[in-house]
Swiss-Prot record:
Ranges of compositional bias, category Polar residues: 12-22, 592-601, 812-824
Name the record gives this protein: Protein bicaudal C homolog 1-A
InterPro entries for this protein: BICC1_KH, BICC1_KH-I_rpt1, BICC1_KH-I_rpt2, BICC1_KH-I_rpt3, BICC1_SAM_dom, KH_dom, KH_dom_type_1, KH_dom_type_1_sf
CDD domains given in the database record: KH-I_BICC1_rpt1, KH-I_BICC1_rpt2, KH-I_BICC1_rpt3, SAM_BICC1
Domain KH: residue ranges: 128-195, 280-344
GO cellular component, one term: cytoplasm
Region listing for Disordered, in residue ranges: 1-48, 592-613, 668-713, 767-834
Low complexity biased stretches: 784-797
Length: 963
């Protein structure tokens, strides 16, 4: 390798008079250096000039076609009264790419003038950059090639100087992975892409064990040789120790990825036959250990996104393992492994360095805005003893174009010098529409490391809305089907609505208001049959305009602002509210299914309607199998189910598809089938979805029968019930004392909902994570999350036996409650201009300005006499188990203080505040009820308890807890 590097660098280690000497033997001697050493105005300045320009000047003089270097510098010395030392014997055509130095001596003003005149002709730094990328040291020789042929060709074609670290030759302990590329921006970016394409691509898979006597396949067999030659591959076999079978290793090049994948598939089919589709393919990616946490992202969100997007499994090594602490393992199908590998390489760090003139001043807030918009880190420092500044721009490889965009904005250039054609799909596998800034990915790469590439969705894109939605659909991953090659648009819409912050598992996604409105317009313009009576967003967020008017002008404003030509006056950043975006991105098929369902059953009405009070709720309808329940008193359960009905007769239904056939029972028919007569049984309609059903509609005149009608569409039957109320029912069923005379029959009514308290939630979570490397976050967050800290173990007990499992399987993220809380009630719509909301995920805090000074408007109409029901209505159901374990009932709860709640383990301030407000309100109501004029039968029967107001829907009031 040393010989290769010497041949690459040419005269890099030799003393080149043109690059290493300040002046040559025949250079003019600055006599004034010795004459006036103590002159306070005397100054010396040393700077580089462009080697090619100086060579051209000397060559032209030798051919008699122009002014010689001697004449050029002599004239400047005479006119500026300075002494100039320059390399007059510069070797023309040398392999060295280093720029030579010029030294000017004289008075300060004269030196400045002389330098300006020299640089006006021989300037080297005006358009020269240095890029440092990460290439594993073991792959340097593969990139360099035999005799340096590979890298020489890259340097010649791109006009760049590429330097590999010399320290790797002697230092066996510490190896450097950094490769430096110097040259023009377009050439530097092209060289980076070419280096990535020269990297080797190795895929491996295990041959199934067919028998003891089965020999290892011969790599020289005609079939294997034919595959190797056709697809330019190298195939080898490795015997596994102490077991029968072999590992097949397929080697190719990154610039031949399609052939490597096709050849591996052919080889797999040849060797494994019908088992080829069941055999996973694996590969390894060596990444420096110091980059692992950065690439994994906050709480591992980046790796989770890559696995969900590609379907591949990614395993990072144990940092304490000294042997293979840098090796990352990928496993899955051939396509998923290659795609995941490209995504990971797109997350490798990049450093772009260039010089800026000393007189250029940039305000810190402009730099901050650039960093936020372009998702880069910018550092500007003055150079010691040089009249210039050094600028360092850091980001990741998938965001390389924005690094050059930042340089263009900082230097005030007309163009970044890099076009989209220079960008490789290796670092950005998602198809690119045009050169622009992805407003979705802004702010993700360095903080959360999301998956959206820098050109997935461009602001100034002029493609049709359908193409835009398809691009978004391909760039966002479904949460439920990581192995699916084509993600379902419905699943994508569900995952988009999962977080109040905008996208699932991406914390703190901040985008400009104008960009948010533009994105929303693009998304909603392609959604058919969309109602105009959608819930308004909470105050402080950009209101959504569902029309397409003015989109092109808005795009131009955003694009120009991001390019730095127009400085936005009041650019405010706000999180994407799921109430204004997520719940609106409904798929065409989903809307069609909704229309069909509306034709068959008025109880399953899904069209967006508004009652006289303006109520417009989102009722999640998820199909789950149910059986008769005998776990609790049937009458009590039915009464509780009836109490969960919304005051509004109509609801907007969002259906999340579940891949299994479901029971025909609906929410209000959860109870025993024995209560149903044969005439009341579910009606099965086996006609085609589009056929006429007038006879059925005429027969189903009563509401109870219409409620049981099901639509036999391609999605299967659906059921409507409220998860929050089911958890309350499960709690009541578990608290119910066994009756000796009553036969208790086990049922699977609650199966899969995660309500069981038989096993701690954390134990199940650890078992499910057994095959994954645990990722411990290095920074704690302030929001509630039961898995963030072991110190919250008492709160974790309230989660039951891994309550998240039901939500994860059915496409409802644990923060779906935050989404529900942002749906506006009529009162919030009327007062949204005057309200001040503390938190969109804490409903009781949000409505404090509506309900009075204490923020908890509980009145005496509250019929519940136990703590679980109160907590459920307040959205604090996750804390029910803590109070039950401490044997605290409602009466004792009313005597608790803030310190008592802390000692119980309620560490979250928002939850304690809601409890204290409820205690205060209930105590106040109890004092009123003790007055003789206010004593009522409900008080005597149910105890001193308050009530929740009627105007606040229970779906909204119980949404802040995370299960």
């Amino acid at each position: 390798m040393a010989a290769q590097c010497e041949s690459i660098g040419g005269d890099m280690n030799q003393s080149d008079p043109g690059s290493n000497s300040e002046r040559s033997a025949d250079s003019p001697v600055p006599g004034s250096e010795d004459d006036s050493p103590h002159d306070p105005e005397w100054r010396e300045e040393r700077f580089r000039v462009d080697r090619k320009k100086l060579e051209t000047m000397l060559q032209a003089a030798a051919e008699g076609k122009g002014k010689s270097g001697e004449d050029f510098f002599q004239k400047i010395m005479e006119e500026t009264n300075t002494q100039i030392a320059w390399p007059s014997k510069l070797k023309i055509g040398a392999k060295s790419k280093k720029d030579p130095h010029i030294k000017v001596s004289g008075k300060k003003e004269n030196v400045k003038e002389a330098k300006e005149r020299i640089m006006s002709v021989l300037d080297t730094k005006s358009n020269r950059v240095t890029l440092k990328m990460d290439v594993l040291h073991t792959e340097h020789s593969h990139v360099i090639g035999k005799g340096g042929n590979n890298i020489k060709k890259v340097m010649e074609e791109t006009g760049c100087h590429i330097h590999f670290p010399d320290s790797n030759r002697n230092n066996q302990a510490e190896k450097s992975n950094q490769v430096s590329i110097a040259g023009q921006p377009a050439g530097v970016e092209s060289a980076r892409v070419r280096i990535r394409e020269l990297l080797p691509l190795v895929l491996m898979f295990e041959l199934p064990i067919a028998g003891i006597l089965q020999p290892i396949p011969d790599p020289n067999s005609p079939t294997i040789q034919q595959i190797s030659q056709t697809y330019n591959l190298t195939v080898s076999f490795k015997q596994r120790s102490r077991v029968y079978g072999a590992t097949v290793i397929v080697r190719g090049s990154q610039n031949n990825t399609s052939a490597v994948k096709e050849g591996t598939a052919m080889l797999l089919e040849h060797l494994a036959g019908s088992l080829a589709t069941a055999i996973p393919v694996s590969t390894q990616l060596d990444i420096a250990a110091q980059h692992h946490l950065f690439m994994m992202g906050r709480n591992g969100c980046n790796i989770k996104h890559i696995m969900q997007r590609t379907g591949a499994q990614i395993h990072f090594p144990d940092p304490n393992n000294p042997l293979k602490k840098s090796t990352v393992y990928l496993q899955g199908t051939i396509d998923s492994v290659c795609l995941a590998r490209q995504y990971l390489m797109g997350c490798l760090p990049l450093v772009l360095m260039f010089d800026m003139k000393e007189e250029i001043e940039i305000e810190p807030q402009c730099i901050t805005q650039l960093m936020e918009q372009l998702d880069v880190f910018i550092s500007i420092k003055p150079k010691p003893k040089q009249p210039s500044k050094s600028v360092i721009v850091k980001s990741v490889e998938r965001n390389a174009l924005n690094m050059y965009e930042a340089r263009k904005c900082l230097l005030g250039l007309d163009s970044s010098g890099v076009t989209v054609t220079n960008q490789s799909t290796l670092s950005c596998p998602v198809p690119m529409n045009c050169h622009g800034l992805d407003i979705l990915a802004a702010g993700l790469g360095l903080s959360g490391l999301g998956l959206l590439g820098p050109n997935t969705l461009s602001v100034n894109s002029t493609t049709a809305q359908n193409s835009l939605l398809n691009a978004l659909n391909s760039s966002l991953s479904p949460l439920h089907s990581p192995s699916s090659a084509a993600p379902s648009p419905t699943l994508w819409a569900a995952s988009l609505a999962n977080n109040a912050t905008g996208f699932s598992a991406i914390p703190h996604l901040m985008i400009p208001s104008a960009a948010q409105a533009t994105l929303t317009n693009f998304l909603l313009s392609g959604v058919p049959n969309y109602g105009q009576n959608t819930p308004s967003p909470p105050p402080g967020l950009t209101p959504v305009d569902v029309h397409m008017n003015g989109i092109h002008s808005e795009c131009k404003k955003v694009t120009s602002a991001l390019n730095g030509h127009v400085k936005p006056t009041n650019m405010k950043y706000g999180t994407i509210s799921s109430s204004s975006l997520g719940d609106k991105v409904l798929n065409t098929n989903l809307a069609e299914a909704s229309r069909q369902s509306n034709n068959h059953s008025s109880a399953e009405e899904v069209n967006s309607k508004t009652d006289p009070e303006g109520c417009n709720d989102a009722f999640v309808e998820v199909g789950m199998p149910r059986s008769p329940s005998h776990s609790a008193n049937t009458k009590d359960l039915k009464q509780m189910l009836n109490s969960t009905k919304a005051p509004c007769p109509t609801r907007q239904t969002v259906k999340l598809l579940h891949g299994t056939k479901n029971s025909h029972l609906h929410g209000e028919r959860l109870l025993s089938d024995s209560e149903m007569s044969p005439m009341e049984g579910p009606v099965t309609d086996k006609k085609a979805p589009g056929s006429e059903r007038a006879a059925e509609r005429a027969a189903a005149q009563q509401n109870s029968e219409r409620a049981r009608l099901t639509s036999q569409s391609e999605y299967g039957t659906m059921q409507a019930y409220d998860y929050e109320q089911k958890k309350l029912l499960a709690t009541k069923a578990m608290l119910k004392k066994p009756v000796v005379t009553e036969v208790r029959t086990p049922t699977n009514t609650w199966s899969g909902l995660g309500f069981s308290k038989s096993t701690p939630a954390e134990t199940i979570k650890e078992l499910r994570r057994a095959n994954h490397v645990p990722y411990k976050p290095t920074m704690t967050t302030t929001y509630e999350n039961s898995s963030l800290s072991r110190s919250n173990s008492r709160e974790q007990l309230g989660n039951g036996s891994d309550s998240e499992n039901w939500r994860e399987r059915n496409g409802i993220d644990s923060s779906q409650n935050d989404y529900s809380s942002s749906i506006g009630s009529p009162k919030r719509k009327q007062n949204k201009s005057a309200e001040h909301y503390l938190s969109s995920s804490n409903y009781m805090d949000c409505i404090s300005s509506l309900t009075g000074s204490n923020g908890c408007n509980l009145n005496s109409s509250f019929k519940g006499s136990d703590l679980p029901e109160l907590f459920s209505k307040l959205g604090l159901g996750k804390y029910t188990d803590i109070f039950q374990q401490q044997e605290i009932d409602l009466q004792t709860f009313l005597t608790l203080t803030d310190q008592d709640l802390k000692e119980l383990g309620i560490s979250t301030f928002g939850a304690r505040r809601k409890m204290l407000l409820a205690i205060s309100e209930l105590n106040k109501n109890r004092r009123k009820l003790f007055e003789p004029t206010n004593i009522r039968a409900s008080f005597l029967e149910g105890g001193a308890s308050g009530r929740l107001p009627r105007q606040y829907h229970t779906d909204i009031a119980s949404v802040s807890g995370r299960w």
